[in-house]
Amino acid sequence: MSEPREFVLDTARGRIAALRLGNPKGPKVLALHGWLDNAASFIPMAPHLGEVDLVAIDMLGHGASTHIPAGYDYAFVDWLHDILDVLDALGWPQAHLLGHSLGGALATVVAAGAPERVLSLALIEALGPPPWPGEHAAERLRKAIAGRRKPASLPRLIPDIATAVRARLQATEKSEAAARLLVERNLKAVEDGYQWRSDPRLMWPSHMRAEEASVRNWLAAIDCPVLLVAADPAPVYFQPEIRNERFACLKHGEMHVIAGTHHVHMDKPAEVAALISAFWTSLAKVP
């Protein structure tokens, strides 16, 4: 595989940075990373995915993409339109969506809401948005409102890359190599050190989310084939019970559970890529 090629896409809400990681003449695959990650999330897997045209983006507020304007926040529904804008900017009427965590949740809802744009879903550690306990809705709403009324804090100064890598390792279980890939794309050099490029507003809690009944209705409406790769042990918000109940809502689903961390696609790229490649190959054989 050739070296990743950097480019940018202009969309309605801002400029989105992207990496082209495959063969531009191959099947079109749009890769969507997880919360506080970036396009580098898919670099380890890319050489194992075969001759696909893999484009991995930094979602707005992440990596090298622009931040949304002051006075706004990162609502889930707005990211859906960002993804459709990216497909338009690429000139792709349809594409296969590959998503990890938040990216997988977004891909799921795009497939439900704009089925004509999505050929298939390959999801890693996600099947719709995280579960939403409705009995805590008022408490979460108050926290979200209070959080937005607070004055913005000053950006944190990070003395060196090693310190940033340690911080990422403490925040989410993953290998050091995976953490370094994500960190290096999400740092900007400043006087006396580094700062995160990601928008601090990504840490704001959501005002509201979809109820579980809505998520399952979306899943049941997905027409395209779906591959789910889940890690064992499962994260708290994606336990086997709810994962399996959601999976049962799909019309055309395939699931594999493998030992690994939440970033299993970075820690075991060849193993996860083999499952995804086999899934895509099976689709090509369908008459």
Give the predicted meaning of each segment.
Residues M1-V29, G50-D53, W92-P93, G128, ...:
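Alpha/beta-hydrolase fold catalytic core
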Residues A12, V55-L98, L102, A274:
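Active-site loop/oxyanion-hole signature of alpha/beta-hydrolase fold enzymes
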Residues R20-H67:
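Conserved HGGG/HGGXW glycine-rich cap/lid loop of the alpha/beta-hydrolase fold
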Residues P93-H136:
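Conserved hydrolase catalytic core segment
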Residues I124-L157:
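A catalytic-pocket lid/entrance helix-loop region that shapes and gates access to the active site
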Residues S153-A210:
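Conserved alpha/beta-hydrolase catalytic His-Asp/Glu region
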Residues A221-G260:
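Conserved loop-alpha-helix segment in the C-terminal half of the alpha/beta-hydrolase fold
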Residues G260-P269, A273:
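Catalytic histidine-centered segment of alpha/beta-hydrolase-like enzymes
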